From Swiss-Prot:
Record-given protein name: Transcription factor A, mitochondrial
Assembly mode: Monomer; binds DNA as a monomer. Homodimer. Component of the mitochondrial transcription initiation complex, composed at least of TFB2M, TFAM and POLRMT. In this complex TFAM recruits POLRMT to the promoter whereas TFB2M induces structural changes in POLRMT to enable promoter opening and trapping of the DNA non-template strand. Upon metabolic stress, forms a complex composed of FOXO3, SIRT3, TFAM and POLRMT. Interacts with TFB1M and TFB2M. Interacts with CLPX; this enhances DNA-binding.
PTM entry text: Phosphorylation by PKA within the HMG box 1 impairs DNA binding and promotes degradation by the AAA+ Lon protease.
Gene: TFAM
UniProt function note: Binds to the mitochondrial light strand promoter and functions in mitochondrial transcription regulation. Component of the mitochondrial transcription initiation complex, composed at least of TFB2M, TFAM and POLRMT that is required for basal transcription of mitochondrial DNA. In this complex, TFAM recruits POLRMT to a specific promoter whereas TFB2M induces structural changes in POLRMT to enable promoter opening and trapping of the DNA non-template strand. Required for accurate and efficient promoter recognition by the mitochondrial RNA polymerase.
PROSITE patterns named among the record's database cross-references: HMG_BOX_2 (PS50118)
Positions of the DNA-binding region: 50-118, 155-219
One annotated GO molecular function: DNA binding, bending
Broad class of where this protein is predominantly found: mitochondrion
Organelle targeting sequence: 1-42
Domains (record comment): Binds DNA via its HMG boxes. When bound to the mitochondrial light strand promoter, bends DNA into a U-turn shape, each HMG box bending the DNA by 90 degrees.
Organism: Homo sapiens (Human)
Modified residues (Phosphoserine): S55, S56, S61, S160, S193, S195
Marked site positions, Intercalates between bases and promotes DNA bending: L58, L182
Amino acid sequence: MAFLRSMWGVLSALGRSGAELCTGCGSRLRSPFSFVYLPRWFSSVLASCPKKPVSSYLRFSKEQLPIFKAQNPDAKTTELIRRIAQRWRELPDSKKKIYQDAYRAEWQVYKEEISRFKEQLTPSQIMSLEKEIMDKHLKRKAMTKKKELTLLGKPKRPRSAYNVYVAERFQEAKGDSPQEKLKTVKENWKNLSDSEKELYIQHAKEDETRYHNEMKSWEEQMIEVGRKDLLRRTIKKQRKYGAEEC
C-alpha cells in the first residue's frame, strides 16, 4: 500500500488526474483503478520493484528461530515465538542496536532504489501499474497473513458434518476425476437418513469443541507475545469491556 501511495504521489506531483493521463480511453475508464488493457511488461516491472527491508525484530526472529528449533525440537512454533519475543525484550540495547542499525542501512538503500525505480516509469506506465500493484498487494497480504497464522500455529477451523463425511468417503467414491468423486459423495450425503447423518454431526460437534479449546489456548499465547491484533473480534470486545469494568 505504501508503494501504491508513492505511485499516486507521482501522479499528483505531475498535477494531472488518472483520467487526464489516459485521454482517449473514453468511457471505458470510469475510475483510476478500472482498466481494460494490462500490458505484458507488468510482471517484469513489478518483479524489479525494490522490496522493503524487514524490521529489526523480524530480522532477529528469523535468525533465532532455527536455533530455538534445534534446541527444542518438540516445542510448538507458538512456544518458540513466545520465547524469542521474550529473548528480544531481554536483549540489551547495545545488541538490539546491531539489528536496528542494519535495518536503517537497508532502509536507506531501499529509499534510493525505489527513487531510481520510479524515475524509470512514464506517467502512463504508472497509471497502468496501479491496478496491478493493488491486486498483487491484496493477494500478497492475504497470503502473508495465511503463512503467518500457519507459522504461529493457529488451530484449523472446525469441519461441518458434511465435510467430515467427504473426508471419509472421498477416496472410495466413484468417479474418474476429483469433480466426479465429489459429485458422487454429495449425492450420497443427500441420500443419507437423519440417523445416518447423526454420527457425522457428532464428529462435527467434537471438532467444534476441539477448535474452541485450541483457539482459547492459542489466543492466550498470542496475548503473551504481544499479538492482540490476531484475536477474534468477540474476544477483543470481551477484554475491552472487562478492562473498563475493572
